[in-house]
């Protein structure tokens, strides 16, 4: 989760945690590692950690420079994704997002959905249908350790 969102919406954060979900650090301001100095990037991750207290980290945009990865891997299990749903795209509808999942998912996939206003309508449509379809196909869901 983005630290700034946790800071702004602590009740929603608690609800997610109490629902049994694992929370991962996603920086405080959704910084792109590629365009950020290592010091600034690490400082931003640390700022988010003040609210999150997680040993999991997922780099925004799935991009991280090697030195940032090296430094963060000392403290975090770094989680990358292999299927981005593009739920944030104004050019896609919920049906398109669901079709992307059906087309590209494979065993072991980590699927990325977003919790932003931009993605809300697609998320609301595609997430429950994706879960239902994935279970029908024999997939299961696991929590990161």
State what each model feature region is:
Residues 18-23, 72-81, 107:
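Glycine-enriched alpha-helix->loop->beta-strand junction motifs that scaffold or abut catalytic
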Residues 6-8, 121-145:
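C-terminal domain-boundary segment and adjacent tail
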Residues 14, 38-45, 93-98, 124-128:
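Charged helix-capping and loop-helix junction motifs
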Residues 1-47, 53-55, 140:
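Active-site beta->alpha N-cap acidic-glycine motif
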Residues 3-6, 29-32, 63, 84-87, ...:
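Short histidine/acidic/glycine/proline-rich micro-motifs that form metal-
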Residues 23-26, 48, 57, 78, ...:
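Conserved, mostly hydrophobic/aromatic
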């Amino acid at each position: 989760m983005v630290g700034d969102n946790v800071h702004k919406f602590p009740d929603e954060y608690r609800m997610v945690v109490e629902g049994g979900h694992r929370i991962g650090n996603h920086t405080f301001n959704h910084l792109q590692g590629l365009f950020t100095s290592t010091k600034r990037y690490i400082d931003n991750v640390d700022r988010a950690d003040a609210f999150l207290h997680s040993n999991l980290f997922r780099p925004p945009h799935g991009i991280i420079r090697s030195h940032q990865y090296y430094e963060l891997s000392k403290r975090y299990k770094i989680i990358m994704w292999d299927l981005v749903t593009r739920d944030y795209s104004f050019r896609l509808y919920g049906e398109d997002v669901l079709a992307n999942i059906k087309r590209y998912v494979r065993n072991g996939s980590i699927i990325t959905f977003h919790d932003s206003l931009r993605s809300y309508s697609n998320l609301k449509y595609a997430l429950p249908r994706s879960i239902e379809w994935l279970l029908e196909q024999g997939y299961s869901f696991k929590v990161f350790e």
